[in-house]
Amino acid sequence: MMLNLGNFIADNVTHRAESMFAADIENNRETLSKEIEGKSLLVIGGAGSIGSSFIKAVLPFKPSKLVVVDLNENGLAELTRDLRSTEGMYVPEEYRTYTLSFADPIFERIFREEKGFDIVANFSAHKHVRSEKDKYSVQALIENNDIKAKRFLDLLSVYPPKHFFCVSTDKAANPVNIMGASKRIMEDMIMAYTSRFKVTTARFANVAFSDGYTVS
């Protein structure tokens, strides 16, 4: 029998039958519907545990279009199976996934031909301190978290979204490692674009049962 992770966490970890965010979502349902219903949505890094959870939380508010980009081809396939097989889950008719990086030329082509999206959420990043294991890993970390992120922000400026969300980390607060510093730089860059489009970012701590975490 396959483990239902949601039920396992509720029964053995949080001991809550209902999400602690359920009341907030319900109290703001009208606002969320107004912001999301009928809007086009782009999710980068949507095959990961946090990105896919975001998608499942947003879909009940009925966006008109969902495009998901991730380098994990199997993860995208699993996401699609999960969405299609979940009873009562709304999936827009215009739902597409692409196995590529947001820094790839083909991504830029997709973005420009779509003329942008109403809502853009980016969950793609090097997120582990162990990404600093050698000089090549550090270069890749900075390239992804900062240099590619800057190019992406410039691309967003061509067709500004109504709302842009980007995930960060608690390690960006008074950073003591390169990964945290790279995310702090990313945060500062994002905030420099607030005059062009609405920006929100959130600092995550370690998320139990997420991909790559010790408890998973």
Give the label of every model feature segment.
Residues 122, 126-143, 147-187, 192, ...:
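Conserved Rossmann-fold NAD(P)-dependent oxidoreductase catalytic core, especially the SDR/UDP-sugar
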Residues 40-61:
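N-terminal Rossmann NAD(P)H-binding glycine-rich loop of SDR-like oxidoreductase domains
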Residues 1-40:
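Non-catalytic terminal and boundary segments that flank Rossmann-like NAD(P)-dependent oxidoreductase
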Residues 74, 105, 172-182, 194-216:
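Flexible, glycine-rich beta-alpha linker
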Residues 95-97, 141, 164, 199-202:
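Hydrophobic/aromatic anchor residues within beta-strands of the central parallel beta-sheet
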Residues 57-68, 84, 90-91, 100-143:
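NAD(P)H-binding glycine-rich loop region in Rossmannoid oxidoreductase-like domains
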Residues 63-64, 159-163, 197:
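A short helix->loop->beta-strand "cap" motif at the edges of active sites that frequently abuts
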Residues 72, 82, 170:
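Residues in the short beta-alpha loop(s) of Rossmann-like NAD(P)-binding domains
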